[in-house]
């Protein structure tokens, strides 16, 4: 099989057409290759209980607009809140013990990320609500298991059997719980704003609940507020937790990076504090993150699409109608693009930024055919700027406040199944509190 030729495979979702990265540019914005339909086919977003997948691909695009605009543009205003929440939750999940103790890294980081993402998406009150934290932490896991259950059945039976499948039932229950929490919150806010207007005052909330509601009203479109939050959870929380956990594993296995990273944090934050500019200037950290994502993206193929018509590519290759299509990410490990591609080199992209014309390409948030950790093109992850800054804040806190190292005998090898590569969910790290050089 040539890595430069398209091929077909059979997976649990049926027939998949895998394209080499050279087609990424053609695929990226082709209107006959539907991102929305792919989500419906892959995740059954048309069925009850899977609304968290549906809302993120809503044709009104308000989710994408919020992630691309409000979330990105408001980062400067929420950075302090993210840092504050991070400091609080680390006391619970990593503890303040100066003695070495073991943690299951992915579980601990899920609790950390659930709190700090919810702080931005829902505000201070809800981000500490135990019921919401349980919902946001478990919905994607349960829904993905439900998807796997349904894939065992013929497509024509799925709308029927989903009413009897255990994880499908749990998914529907979590959606209802989310609505019972979020809808009253939104209604209360609307009443407060209406009352404030009557008295000539103004009430604003700088979080995703507000951004989504304002944008939906502005565009005159309907949306499901609770499922929009579940969609943010699916898109932001679980993928970010996986990415962040893998970064920690890679640093733990390359401990020579720890002191240079700490020195960079102290130099940058010591002078500039928390700001968009200071996070940009954490260039070694940015390089380490991008290298971690290069070696272990969330999947070995990206740019999931569904062909709504026969699609003829520039060299005559025809993608038949009604097929799921993806683009291979194998250039991540191709020596033609990366020297010693299987070696973890934390300075790889740090050094690349110094090469003429490559400063932009070498940044974590840049999406290219040879690094599709965040996808590529029109549907590249719109929340990658937020994810980048959120991870940098959390990693800065951990590097300054904790020592950490691998636990002997605990494998950090990613879990691979199908097209997926997940950070090992059972791997442990040994951590202990240290005295930070500067207050952050």
Curated annotation (Swiss-Prot):
Residue spans crossing the bilayer: none
This protein's encoding gene: P450-1
Annotated family: Belongs to the cytochrome P450 family.
Gene3D superfamilies in UniProt: Cytochrome P450
Biological pathway: Plant hormone biosynthesis; gibberellin biosynthesis
Entry-linked Pfam families: p450
Residues noted as binding heme in the record, renumbered to the chain: 381
Lineage, highest ranks first: Eukaryota, Fungi, Dikarya, Ascomycota, Pezizomycotina
PANTHER family: CYTOCHROME P450, CYTOCHROME P450 MONOOXYGENASE AUSG-RELATED
One record GO biological process: gibberellin biosynthetic process
Name used for this protein in its record: Cytochrome P450 monooygenase 1
GO molecular function terms attached to this record: heme binding; iron ion binding; monooxygenase activity; oxidoreductase activity, acting on paired donors, with incorporation or reduction of molecular oxygen
Keyword Protein transport found: no
Induction note: Expression is induced under gibberellin-producing conditions.
Swiss-Prot/TrEMBL keywords: Heme, Iron, Metal-binding, Monooxygenase, Oxidoreductase
Function of the protein: GA14 synthase; part of the gene cluster that mediates the biosynthesis of gibberellins (GAs), diterpenoids that may provide a selective advantage during infection of the preferred host plant, rice. Gibberellins (GAs) are diterpenoids and are synthesized via the mevalonate pathway. Biosynthesis of the major metabolite GA3 (gibberellic acid) from geranylgeranyl diphosphate (GGPP) requires 13 steps.
The protein's required cofactors: heme
Disruption phenotype: Leads to the loss of gibberellins production accumulates ent-kaurenoic acid but not later intermediates.
Keyword flag Oxidoreductase: yes
Species the sequence originates in: Gibberella fujikuroi (strain CBS 195.34 / IMI 58289 / NRRL A-6831)
Enzyme Commission no: 1.-.-.-
């Amino acid at each position: 099989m040539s890595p430069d030729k398209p091929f077909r495979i059979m997976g649990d979702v049926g027939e998949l057409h895998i394209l080499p990265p050279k087609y990424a540019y053609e695929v990226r914005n082709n209107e006959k290759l539907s991102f929305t339909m792919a989500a419906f086919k892959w995740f059954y977003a048309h069925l009850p209980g899977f609304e968290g997948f549906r809302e993120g691909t809503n044709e009104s695009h308000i989710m994408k607009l919020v992630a691309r605009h409000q979330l990105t543009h408001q980062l400067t205003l929420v950075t302090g809140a993210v840092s504050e929440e991070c400091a609080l939750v680390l006391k619970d999940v990593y503890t303040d013990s100066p003695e070495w103790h073991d943690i299951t890294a992915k579980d601990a980081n899920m609790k950390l990320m659930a709190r700090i993402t919810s702080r931005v998406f829902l505000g201070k009150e809800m981000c500490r609500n135990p019921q919401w934290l349980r919902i946001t932490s478990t919905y994607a896991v349960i829904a993905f298991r439900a998807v796997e259950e349904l894939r065992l059945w013929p497509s024509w039976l799925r709308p029927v059997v989903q009413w009897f499948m255990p994880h499908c039932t749990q998914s529907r229950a979590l959606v209802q719980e989310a609505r019972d929490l979020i809808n009253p919150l939104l209604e209360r806010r609307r009443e407060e704003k209406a009352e404030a207007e009557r008295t000539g005052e103004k009430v604003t909330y700088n979080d995703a609940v507000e951004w989504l509601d304002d944008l939906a009203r502005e565009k005159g479109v309907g949306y499901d507020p609770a499922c929009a939050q579940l969609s943010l959870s699916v898109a932001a929380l679980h993928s970010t937790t996986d990415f962040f956990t893998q970064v920690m594993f890679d640093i733990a296995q390359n401990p020579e990076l720890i002191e240079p990273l700490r020195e960079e944090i102290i130099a940058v934050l010591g002078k500039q504090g928390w700001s968009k500019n200071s996070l940009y200037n954490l260039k070694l950290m940015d390089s380490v993150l991008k290298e971690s994502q290069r070696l272990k993206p969330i999947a070995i193929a990206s740019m999931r699409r569904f062909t709504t018509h026969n699609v003829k590519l520039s060299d005559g290759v025809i993608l038949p109608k009604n097929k799921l299509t993806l683009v291979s990410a194998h250039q991540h490990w191709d020596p033609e693009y990366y020297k010693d591609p299987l070696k973890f080199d934390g300075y790889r992209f740090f050094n690349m930024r110094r090469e003429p014309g490559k400063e932009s390409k070498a940044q974590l948030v840049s999406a290219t055919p040879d690094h599709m950790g965040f996808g590529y093109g029109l549907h590249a992850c719109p929340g990658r700027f937020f994810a980048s800054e959120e991870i940098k804040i959390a990693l800065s806190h951990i590097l300054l406040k904790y020592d950490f190292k691998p636990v002997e005998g605990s494998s950090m090898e990613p879990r691979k199944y199908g097209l997926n590569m997940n950070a090992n969910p059972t791997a442990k790290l040994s951590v202990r509190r240290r005295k930070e050089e500067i207050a952050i």
